[in-house]
Amino acid sequence: RLESTGSTMRNEAVKSLAHGNPDLAQRALNRERQANKIFVLMLRLIFTSYHNPNLARAVGLDDGFPLIGYRSIAKNLELTADNAEDIAEIALESENNTLEVDSATMKRIRDFTDQVNELTEMAVEAAVERDYNTAIEVREQFSGIGNRVQEILDDLPEMDNTDLLEVREVLVSLQQTAEYAVRNAEIATNLALNEESQHTTIQ
């Protein structure tokens, strides 16, 4: 739920920039409170489960080891919601609530957003399912978009410094979100390897 809230915020913020629609940016900002609330509830559940083995078993955990990883994942997801909030604030503060780029560049930014969304969703799925292969796929896909920010910036025409900074801040926020997804995938890898699977044998 925290991942999907962050993803929705990201989509609304970037769509706001694409269409010059401040209402969408405001909607994204309003969701930040919901994201924080989910994060706090998750921390409470994790903390309580860690100290109560019966509760941990009730939510499908045989031991407390995954809870440490889940706490880190929750924090990373909360930070991705902060990234989306940053993009929404740029949309509200920028002139005409949009970026000073052509439609082709805006499409590249939206495509990049879609790729980032896919990474964050896959990373959480890998952690929940303890799926080693999905976790590895996240890292492989990330390597394929690792230079996307620089590629888009390099292709921009000469522009006002303020406009350039806004574009750069949006792209960096998306890049950071992708990096958090990779961190979550690394945690998912550890969770998967902690279980008996085709990759490991636990004595």
Enumerate the language-model features and the residues they cover:
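Cytosolic, long alpha-helical scaffolding segments
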Residues: 1-203
